[in-house]
From Swiss-Prot:
The active site is at Y110, H116, K147. Belongs to the tRNA-intron endonuclease family. Archaeal short subfamily. One of its GO terms (biological process) is tRNA-type intron splice site recognition and cleavage. It comes from Pyrococcus horikoshii (strain ATCC 700860 / DSM 12428 / JCM 9974 / NBRC 100139 / OT-3). The keyword Cell wall biogenesis/degradation does not apply. It comes from the Archaea. Endonuclease that removes tRNA introns. Cleaves pre-tRNA at the 5'- and 3'-splice sites to release the intron. The products are an intron and two tRNA half-molecules bearing 2',3' cyclic phosphate and 5'-OH termini. Recognizes a pseudosymmetric substrate in which 2 bulged loops of 3 bases are separated by a stem of 4 bp. This is tRNA-splicing endonuclease. Keywords: Lyase, tRNA processing. It is an enzyme of class 4 (lyase). Its EC number is 4.6.1.16.
Length: 170
């Protein structure tokens, strides 16, 4: 994209009514959620696309840069930074990444052009504890909706390691 598409901050999301945004970002690349004639992006999507130079975010006539969006996201979610690292890693690998809040996870991940997601991703810091009950519950939900449960562990250097968790019945 040559000229960044303008988006406007609205609460914990950004939106655009521009047809170019809908065609290039939503229809062609799977970003955001379309509601009527508006394309809404999460703050993580907005930060990613701002960092790539594809969009610019405006709040009250002031442009929000990548660092501003990261700071805003971190003020609303203490794990915003690691969720962003995982989001960026998956998007850079060519996957479509959507919220998985309704499945009790952070992300649903789709292969490009796939209608259904293959994975549910739960993002954790390397030193963060997760109880066996948390792991079991997430694996059970993923199995119930025919998806693979994946733990994305982010170390202090910002590197991500993915662990697939399977529900096995004997």
């Amino acid at each position: 994209m040559k000229k960044p598409i303008e988006f406007y901050l609205s609460g914990d999301r950004v939106y655009s009514t521009r047809e170019k945004a809908i065609n290039q970002l939503y229809n062609n690349r799977g970003y955001g959620e379309l509601k009527g004639d508006k394309l809404f992006l999460s703050l993580i999507e907005a930060a990613y696309l701002t960092e790539k130079g594809w969009i610019k975010v405006v709040d009250k006539d002031k442009e929000l840069k990548f660092d501003d969006l990261m700071k805003l996201g971190k003020s609303r979610d203490e794990d915003f930074d690691i969720k962003y690292i995982v989001y960026k890693d998956l998007r850079d690998r060519g996957y479509i990444v959507k919220s998985a809040l309704k499945f009790g996870s952070h992300y649903r991940v789709y292969r490009k052009d796939a209608e259904h997601s293959d994975w549910l991703i739960w993002v954790l810091r390397e030193n963060q504890r997760l109880s066996p009950n948390d792991i079991t519950a997430r694996a059970r939900v993923a199995h119930g909706v025919r998806k693979n449960m994946v733990l994305a562990i982010v170390d202090e250097d910002g590197d991500v390691v993915y662990y697939k968790v399977e529900w096995i019945k004997f």
